[in-house]
From Swiss-Prot:
<dbReference type="GO" id="GO:0005737">
    <property type="term" value="C:cytoplasm"/>
</dbReference>
<comment type="similarity">
    <text>Belongs to the ZapD family.</text>
</comment>
<comment type="subunit">
    <text>Interacts with FtsZ.</text>
</comment>
<dbReference type="InterPro" id="IPR036268">
    <property type="entry name" value="ZapD_sf"/>
</dbReference>
<comment type="function">
    <text>Cell division factor that enhances FtsZ-ring assembly. Directly interacts with FtsZ and promotes bundling of FtsZ protofilaments, with a reduction in FtsZ GTPase activity.</text>
</comment>
<keyword id="KW-0963">Cytoplasm</keyword>
<dbReference type="Pfam" id="PF07072">
    <property type="entry name" value="ZapD"/>
</dbReference>
<dbReference type="InterPro" id="IPR027462">
    <property type="entry name" value="ZapD_C"/>
</dbReference>
<dbReference type="GO" id="GO:0032153">
    <property type="term" value="C:cell division site"/>
</dbReference>
<dbReference type="GO" id="GO:0000917">
    <property type="term" value="P:division septum assembly"/>
</dbReference>
<dbReference type="InterPro" id="IPR009777">
    <property type="entry name" value="ZapD"/>
</dbReference>
<keyword id="KW-0132">Cell division</keyword>
<keyword id="KW-0717">Septation</keyword>
<protein>
    <recommendedName>
        <fullName>Cell division protein ZapD</fullName>
    </recommendedName>
</protein>
<keyword id="KW-0131">Cell cycle</keyword>
<dbReference type="GO" id="GO:0043093">
    <property type="term" value="P:FtsZ-dependent cytokinesis"/>
</dbReference>
Amino acid sequence: MILYEYPFNERIRTLLRLEDLFERFAFFLAQEDPREHHVALTTLFEIAEVTGRADLKSDLMKELERQRQTLAPFRGNPGIEQNALEAVLGEIEQTLANLAQMQGKTGQHLVDNEWLASIRSRAVIPGGTCKFDLPSYYAWQQWPAEQRRQDIAKWVAPLLPLRDAAAIVLRLARESGQASKVMAMQGSYQQMLSGRTYQLMQVRVPPELHVIPEASANKYMLWVRFTMQDGDVRPRAVDIDVPFHLTLCNL
C-alpha cells in the first residue's frame, strides 16, 4: 500500500515538512560524494528556515508536556504494558530536557558562522555555488568524506532536539488512529466528522491502481477524490470505484 498523509492544521503541516527534511538530510549525509554532501548542507539550511519559526520550540514543549501528563497516570495500570509506557515517557522527558537546554534563537549558530552564511546566501542563486564563486567551499568539498560528514553533523547538532520532538509528536499522532477499509464510489469519498477534531489523515491505496488521492476537510466533513496521472497532462479525476484504507489521527 502507498501511504499519503494530509495534515489538518498548520502545526502538523510544519512537523511533516520537518520530518521530510530531516529524512532527506540523513540520506545525503550518509553518502560519500561531495555533491551529495552539498545537498545535505542545503537541506540543513532549509531545516534552519523551518525551525527558525519563533513558536515552534514552545509549541513542541507544550505538546510533549501535555502528552506526558496524559500518559503518566497509566503507570501501574495492569491493562497497560508498562515497559512500553516507561520507554515513551522516558523519551518524552529526555526530549523535553534537551529542548529546555536550547539557548538563544533557533539556528542562530548558522547565521553567526560567516562562512556558512556566505554559502547559504549563494545557494539560493541558480548555480551560485560554483568553484569560482566559493573557492573555499570547493576546497572543503575536496576534504575526505568523513571529515565533511563530521562538520555537517556538528552544524546540525543544535537542531536535533527539535527533530526528536517532532518525531515523538508525529508518532503518537499516527498511533492514535485506527484504519478502516472504505470505498470511493466513482473515485469520490466523503465522511461526516461530527464535530470531532483531527490532526492528521492517512490514506493508503493499492499501488497497482495507479491512483492519486486529493483530500480536503473542515470541522464537519472530509473529502477524498482520486485522480490518475497520464503522461505529461495534469492528473484527471477517475470514475472507477477505489478501495482504500482511511485513518483519522487525533492526539
